[in-house]
Amino acid sequence: MSAEPSPTIHVPVLPAEVIQALCITAQGIYVDGTVGGGGHAELIASQLDPDGLLIGLDQDLLALARCESRLNGKPVMLAHSNFCELPEVLQQIEVGPINGILLDLGLSSDQLEDIDRGFSFNSSGPLDLRFNTASGEPAWRLIQRLRPEHLADII
């Protein structure tokens, strides 16, 4: 990931409860399957020693860049991947048993505030609606291309 992204504005939800529920051990292996801006990931990684590992996955390249900057120097491995591809990611990196997995599903404040993503009702911008902007068609193109019946099926 190249250019330095702007800092995240997203605040992780229920941070104390998440950490408590994961029962983190210093040498454990944990997965944040929706790592986003790295809020929960930073809390998890701060409790790991060099033998521990946090594996962070996200579809959003900009979120991964923010997370990479935020977690620099911590025992973290990041992957541009959807959490449904976790088995393949784990097979590639050949790690031991996973001690805990976190999925914080939904949109982040960063995605809502990015007018180029089209997730917000408060801003006017292109109707993209993709978490992974490197894959698939933006919504505006689908709307132009598909017949109304197909759009109704999607919605």
Region locations from a protein language model:
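S-adenosyl-L-methionine-dependent methyltransferase catalytic core, i.e., the SAM/SAH-binding region
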Residues: 1-155
